[in-house]
Design a protein with these regions (language model features):
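Short acidic-hydrophobic, aromatic-tinged amphipathic segments that line or gate anion-handling sites
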Residues: 43-49, 121-125, 156
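Generic C-terminus detector
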Residues: 364-367, 372-420
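Internal nucleotide-binding/catalytic subdomain
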Residues: 152, 156-293
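A conserved helix-loop-beta module that forms one wall/lid of the active-site cleft
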Residues: 90-151
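ATP-binding N-terminal substructure of ATP-dependent carboxylate-amine bond-forming enzymes
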Residues: 1-94
């Protein structure tokens, strides 16, 4: 069995390490992968959005199964293209990936099907949006409709900042066509929970919950990043919250997508906020979260490839999906200056006894050395019986990994510990 994983970050490394547990799989290719993933898969220099290159590679190398992990190729229709040449895939088709690809689509879907989310208005005209902001409640949240590298959400605590956001998205086209339409929505408050799920379009099985740490600095300060660390499970996700989510959000979403003729198959990610008025959807993603995947998959006891095949074949209801009852913590080591400006090319040293705990995101291999090549460089995941031990053990490994200009948050898991 030859597998191809599209993508090249820490999430893909976590997926590949988990897939390797399956004995049927003889070969894994990563497109493009990275210098760290190269230890676990054969990396092929084809970019994740080069759909022609991906399809050609798959055909020429008799790939048996493809996992498309990042948002862009999914939204661009990578799965549709691979299925068209007979390759079964894990990941939604473009008509379902739109749940992440268009915030206007997802907000309208939730409104139509009564799925709880922040109240909102949609605008395709900057003047109307600016006029609305004269009287809108503040703080308010401005979201570019399309994909924007995780930067398309602006929380404005003054009317002036809100208007500036509208101008930069709609008039200055900061995110290009992604800003042709915007959503302006109610500002919600409460603890956030990430829930990744497997769904085959009918059945939905939530994975263990997790908590991301999106801001760059300790104490949740500084700019938003792709995520500086995660813990799982999330202590705010109690059994009662899980039941509410299943009844009001998870099942209704899967049914809504089916009813719209857009059955979602793959990993559907729910970004949730537990507000005083109940759990609400902040965002959907059409893929595994990063770095949520680096704590969720290491806790998965069942075989990932078996579950993925069941999702593709519409047999998820017959397939066990079991998680460990332990805790996981992942600390991201980044290049200092991320997410704005950072230097690259520094040698990374990872002690041999902990390489299996390290998921590499931004590193290149050169002359046998592993060099930093991105903002988020790697994630270090520890598992333990108690959350505190997982956090301590992850930080103990971080202290043993070296590269110049390394930066990491020192408080991953602190909020989760305080919630207990
Ligand atoms: P996203 O880029 O969609 O992941 O959103 C980034 C972050 O913005 C989320 O994780 C939330 O912390 C925050 N956010 C998004 N929408 C809202 C909202 N309506 N109210 C409060 N915070 C929000
Ligand atoms: N960690 C959030 C995301 O993957 O979008």
């Amino acid at each position: 069995m030859k597998i191809m994983v599209v993508g090249g970050g820490g999430r893909e490394h976590a997926i590949i390490k988990k897939l390797k547990e399956n004995q049927e799989i003889e070969k894994i290719y990563a497109l493009p992968g990275n210098g760290g993933i190269a230890a676990d898969a054969e990396c092929v220099p084809i970019g994740a959005t080069d759909l022609d290159g991906i399809v050609k590679f798959a055909a020429e190398n008799a790939i048996d199964y493809a996992v498309v992990a990042p948002d862009d190729p999914l939204v661009m229709g990578c799965v549709d293209r691979l299925e068209a040449i007979g390759i079964p895939c894990f990941g939604p088709r473009a008509n379902a990936a739109i749940i992440e690809g268009s915030k206007v689509f997802s907000k309208n879907l939730m409104k139509q099907y009564g799925i709880p989310t922040a109240a909102y208005e949609v605008f395709d005209d900057a003047e109307k949006a600016l006029a609305y902001l004269e009287t809108a409640p503040i703080p308010t949240v401005i979201k570019a409709d399309g994909l924007a590298l995780g930067k398309g959400v602006i929380i404005a605590d003054t009317r002036e900042k809100a208007k500036a956001a509208v101008i930069s998205i709609m008039q200055d086209k900061q995110f290009g066509k992604s800003g042709d339409q915007i959503v302006i929505e109610e500002f919600l408050e409460g603890p956030e929970v990430s829930v990744l799920s497997f769904t085959d379009g009918e059945t939905i099985v939530p994975m263990i919950s997790s908590m991301d740490h999106k801001r760059a600095g300790d104490g949740d300060t500084g700019l938003n990043t792709g995520g500086m660390g995660t813990v799982a499970p999330n202590p705010y996700y109690t059994d009662a919250v899980a039941e509410e989510c299943m009844n009001n959000i998870f099942l209704p979403t899967v049914k809504a997508m089916k009813a719209e003729g857009r059955p979602f198959k793959g990993c559907l990610y729910f970004g949730l906020m537990i507000t005083k008025d109940g759990v609400k959807v902040i965002e959907y993603n059409c893929r595994f979260g990063d770095p949520e995947t680096q704590v969720v998959l290491p806790l998965l006891k069942s075989d990932l490839f078996t579950i993925m095949r069941a999702v593709t074949d519409g047999k998820l209801s017959e397939t066990p999906v079991e998680f460990s009852d332990k805790y996981a913590a992942c600390v991201i080591m980044a290049s200092d200056g991320y997410p704005v400006k950072y230097e690259k090319g520094y040698e990374i040293t990872i002690p041999a006894d902990i390489t299996d705990k390290v998921f590499v995101a931004g590193a290149a291999k050169k002359d046998g050395k592993l060099l930093t090549s991105g903002g988020r460089v790697l994630g270090v995941t520890a598992i333990a019986d108690q959350l505190k031990d997982a956090i301590d053990s992850s930080y103990a490994m971080v202290d043993r990994i070296h590269f110049d200009n390394a930066y990491w948050r020192h408080d991953i898991g602190k909020r989760a510990m305080e919630a207990k």
